[in-house]
């Protein structure tokens, strides 16, 4: 085989140029790096990477082609107390690999060692990187660039979304291809969503603990290779990249953006008992936040935390994000446990990675959404991210649930969340779209479960129901579990309608959890991360089509209301909003402080939302003018003209002025 030449230090990873492959690897503390190439029979040939530019090792292999399988062995000190854990007996994944074959098994051969390095070679079972070609015919694809004011996000799991869809061809159900199938495109358009936010599609692993329980990591928040697609969602692992890009292209044709949920806060190497397969053996001290005793800072709850303030690691993260935008045309990112991105180790709004992203001509043009917390000290940072970032707003989630399901929130607090949470986000030039409003997400109860379960039921997760949040602000309406009397079903339906209407007609950017518009239930499991089964897969044949129609009508109504689409903060007397009491008069100071009462919200002088959060029927006098109840609260062909709305308990209605 051809010998390696020096090559060059960029771009990251293994890059095919039509004649050969350039390999690069960042390691500040390595003393020697071996590129290991494997043939079809698994025979290994090793080459020392001959070039080093700063902390980047590199080499060029002429005549190498896409499909070549490779990995690395990295030599250096074994000094655990100092954070160094080099062990060339372990074959390592290229952090920038575009494709990975194989999986991590619960096998002692993946262990690096404790006081001394584990000398057992693991190449026969270790995952292998595969060289791929990035070439693709995008035709005339262009990003939709939907303004924040018009954006409605739909959070979905690639497999769970379509795995049980009877109208999707069986061979592509639960796969990337299904996302771009006409059945799904038509559904997204009918529903009215503008952005599909995909739970992790980057190559991930199941934790050894789950493997021992016979479970898998279904959600995918345990990354192995940040540049590689998860192969299980492809019809053919060899074509995963093209299958994903085909789906993105079809979604773009329909005007739908694609947002990736990305995990750049930890890796699947977990804690010191976890497997060594990549970063730990490449440069443990650089990639992770290390304590003085050599252990990991666990600000993620997953055993380790990436040190994104390290220049080399920061560049790795930036290159990863640019790759997904430039090579796969994604339209943005939702950053899991995003406070890690700003740790220096204390959180800073001007942290190096934040500054680099905002100054990047590629990344500054896409949607950036933070989950604005981690579990470390000072990790809760809602409202404190840089100007280009939007953030998940847990204040909105909790206030909306408390108002409708607990009835222990003042009108003033509710109105503040409805109006975009200006107390949290109106700073540094940020606009209301920075508030990602949600009532539910993958993490927690589904919408139906919010009204059917007061307590979590996570026994199937194998942790004796200890996992998952106990602070759900839910209400079973008098009976724990699904089903019940007609009266119970109607009261739960009214609560679901109230929660959805609040979500979709509030100032800010709404995010809808896939399946909530169907009435999907996880039977009270509020942490279904390891449930790859019918508990999490959407059941399209039993979907509540009436609720789907209700949701779609609200989304389409939202797009008609200028106060919600302008993405401007509401000011007093600007015509965007008026807050009225049940008699149609401006709310008094005293009324703002009431915990359980009624109100009316007038938007853009033409739309009126009447709310009754009390447990009783209340007559609400509409303000002066001719008001018609509109879909989905009245028939389109027979609108109801009212002067007084007989407000049902825990209910609401939307009107339009003639």
Swiss-Prot record:
Catalytic activity: Hydrolysis of (1->6)-alpha-D-glucosidic linkages to branches with degrees of polymerization of three or four glucose residues in limit dextrin
Site features described as Transition state stabilizer, chain residue numbers: 443
InterPro entries reported for this sequence: GlgX_C, GlgX_Isoamylase_N_E_set, Glyco_hydro_13_cat_dom, Glyco_hydro_13_N, Glyco_hydro_b, Glycogen_debranch_bac, Glycogen_debranch_GlgX, Glycoside_hydrolase_SF
A molecular-function term among this protein's GO annotations: hydrolase activity, hydrolyzing O-glycosyl compounds
GO terms classed as biological process: glycogen catabolic process
Database matches in NCBIfam families: glgX_debranch, PRK03705.1
Similarity field: Belongs to the glycosyl hydrolase 13 family.
The protein's name in its UniProt record: Glycogen debranching enzyme
């Amino acid at each position: 085989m051809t010998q390696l030449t020096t090559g060059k230090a960029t771009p990251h990873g293994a890059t095919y140029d039509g004649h050969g492959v350039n390999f690069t690897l960042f390691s500040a503390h390595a003393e020697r790096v071996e590129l290991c190439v494997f043939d079809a029979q698994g025979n290994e040939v090793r080459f020392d990477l001959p070039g080093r530019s700063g902390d980047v090792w590199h080499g060029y292999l002429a005549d190498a082609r896409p499909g070549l399988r490779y990995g690395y062995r990295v030599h250096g000190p074994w000094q655990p107390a100092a954070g160094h854990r080099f062990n060339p007996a372990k074959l390592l994944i290229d952090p920038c690999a575009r494709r990975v074959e194989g999986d991590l098994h619960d096998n002692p051969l993946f262990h690096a060692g404790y006081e001394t390095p584990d000398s057992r070679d693991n190449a026969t079972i270790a995952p292998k990187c595969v060289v791929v070609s990035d070439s693709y015919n995008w035709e005339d694809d262009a990003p939709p660039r939907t303004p924040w004011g018009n954006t409605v996000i739909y959070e979905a799991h690639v497999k769970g979304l379509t795995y049980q869809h009877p109208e999707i061809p069986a061979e592509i159900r639960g796969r990337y291809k299904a996302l771009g199938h006409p059945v799904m495109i038509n559904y997204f358009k009918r529903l009215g969503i503008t952005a599909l936010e995909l739970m992790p599609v980057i190559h991930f692993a199941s934790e050894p603990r789950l493997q021992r329980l016979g479970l898998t990591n279904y959600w995918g928040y345990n990354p192995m290779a940040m540049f590689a697609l998860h192969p299980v969602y492809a019809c053919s692992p060899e074509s995963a990249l093209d299958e994903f890009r085909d789906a993105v292209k079809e979604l773009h044709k329909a005007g739908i953006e694609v947002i990736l949920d990305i995990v750049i806060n930890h890796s699947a190497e977990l804690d010191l008992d976890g497997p060594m397969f990549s970063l730990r053996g490449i440069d443990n001290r650089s990639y992770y936040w290390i304590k003085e005793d050599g252990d990991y800072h666990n600000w993620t709850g997953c055993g380790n935390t990436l040190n994104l303030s390290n220049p080399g690691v920061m560049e790795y993260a930036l290159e990863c994000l640019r790759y997904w935008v430039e090579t796969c045309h994604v339209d943005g990112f939702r950053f899991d446990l995003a406070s890690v991105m700003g740790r220096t180790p204390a959180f800073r709004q001007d942290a190096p990675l934040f500054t680099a992203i905002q100054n990047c001509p590629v990344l500054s043009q896409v949607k950036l959404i933070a989950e604005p917390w981690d579990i470390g000290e000072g990790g809760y940072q809602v409202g404190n991210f840089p100007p280009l970032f939007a953030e998940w707003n847990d204040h909105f989630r909790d206030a909306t649930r408390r108002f409708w399901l607990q009835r222990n929130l003042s009108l003033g607090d509710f109105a503040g969340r409805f109006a975009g949470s200006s107390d949290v986000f109106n700073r540094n030039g940020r606009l209301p779209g920075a508030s990602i409003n949600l009532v539910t997400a993958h993490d927690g109860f589904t919408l139906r479960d919010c009204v059917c379960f007061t307590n979590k039921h996570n026994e199937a997760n194998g942790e004796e129901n200890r996992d998952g949040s106990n602070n759900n602000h839910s209400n079973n309406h008098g009976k724990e579990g699904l089903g019940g009397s007609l009266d119970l079903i109607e009261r739960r339906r009214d609560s679901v309608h109230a929660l959805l209407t609040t979500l979709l007609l509030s100032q800010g950017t709404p995010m809808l959890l896939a399946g909530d518009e169907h009435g999907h239930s996880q039977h009270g499991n509020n942490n279904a991360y390891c449930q790859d089964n019918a508990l999490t897969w959407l059941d399209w044949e039993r979907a509540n089509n009436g609720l789907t129609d209700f949701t779609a009508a609200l989304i389409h109504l939202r797009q008609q209301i200028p106060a919600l689409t302008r993405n401007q903060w509401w000011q007093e007397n600007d015509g965007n909003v008026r807050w009225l009491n049940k008699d149609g008069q401006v709310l008094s100071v005293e009324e703002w402080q009431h915990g359980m009462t009624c109100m009316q919200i007038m938007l853009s002088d033409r739309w009126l939302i009447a709310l009754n959060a009390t447990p009783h029927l209340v007559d609400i006098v509409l303000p002066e003018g001719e008001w018609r109840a509109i879909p989905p609260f009245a028939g389109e062909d027979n609108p109801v003209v009212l002067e007084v709305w007989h407000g049902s308990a825990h209910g609401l209605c939307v009107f339009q002025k003639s």
